[in-house]
Amino acid sequence: LSLLGHDERVTPEPFDSVTAQNARGNQADVQSLPR
C-alpha cells in the first residue's frame, strides 16, 4: 500500500480501519488453525 505515507499527513483513520480489519482476519486465521 503506497497510500500509507499520504494518509499519515491527511488522516490516520482510514489506515486504522484497515489495520483493524487485518487484525480481525489474523484472529480468525489463528482460531481456524488446529491446536
Curated annotation (Swiss-Prot):
Cofactor detail note: Binds 1 heme b (iron(II)-protoporphyrin IX) group per subunit.
Induction data: By incubation with textile industry wastewater.
Region spans: Disordered: 1-35
Enzyme class label: oxidoreductase
Compositional bias annotation for Basic and acidic residues: 1-11
Superkingdom of origin organism: Eukaryota
BP terms from Gene Ontology: hydrogen peroxide catabolic process
Keywords for the protein's UniProt record, in alphabetical order: Heme, Hydrogen peroxide, Iron, Manganese, Metal-binding, Oxidoreductase, Peroxidase
Compositionally skewed regions (Polar residues) per UniProt: 18-35
GO molecular function list: manganese peroxidase activity; metal ion binding
EC number, as in UniProt: 1.11.1.13
Catalytic activity, as annotated: 2 Mn(2+) + H2O2 + 2 H(+) = 2 Mn(3+) + 2 H2O
Cofactor(s) listed in the protein's UniProt record: heme b; Ca(2+)
Biological function: Has manganese peroxidase activity.
UniProt similarity note: Belongs to the peroxidase family.
Protein name: Manganese peroxidase
